[in-house]
């Protein structure tokens, strides 16, 4: 689900703004106040259209909010609301359009019907005949506040041994403040000896991204329920628990 281009009309600080994306890594450069955060916000809205059809309690379609309307003041008088339009192309779906005419209206999704129909069908297949072979796209968003954010969530959600695959999308585009919750889940699974394949996936991902074949920083993860601690084994021999990881390493682990 690579996004190839996006155009904003009357979105936040942009009257009209168009961006093309390369298929690999894209970097945004700009001075303070030029709209980088607004662009990222718009991209989250566009990417979340996947969840307009692939929808359950673990997913969330963000939509265009009241704060996304352009606000202009002339001689102390605020201008009338202008329709917000976000048009974008995925590699597989072109000319997708989300719009909202006013703050009293909801986000119109008629312009993403092909995508919505596809994702609804994908969710149906996943719910009825999934044997683990159905490939799902990856969505994730992280900000500079990720590990420092404090969120009050129901921990019981992370304590359920068996979760549907959609649980991997839980707040995936609003994921700040989740590090401690995911560490807690690893401890719960290890203690109950349940869903051990989920732990194995995490360990393999850490090893592949941060281990010998990756960044060569962290080689392995050990989960010790009796100590209520998750330890990270560094390639230099150090063993550090999750609470004492430096901000930089904690961010790396959180992203993986």
Predicted regions and their residues:
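Active-site-flanking alpha-helical
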Residues: 44, 254-255
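P-loop NTPase switch/coupling surface
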Residues: 1-178, 194-198, 208-214
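Extended helical coiled-coil dimerization/tether regions that scaffold
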Residues: 167-254
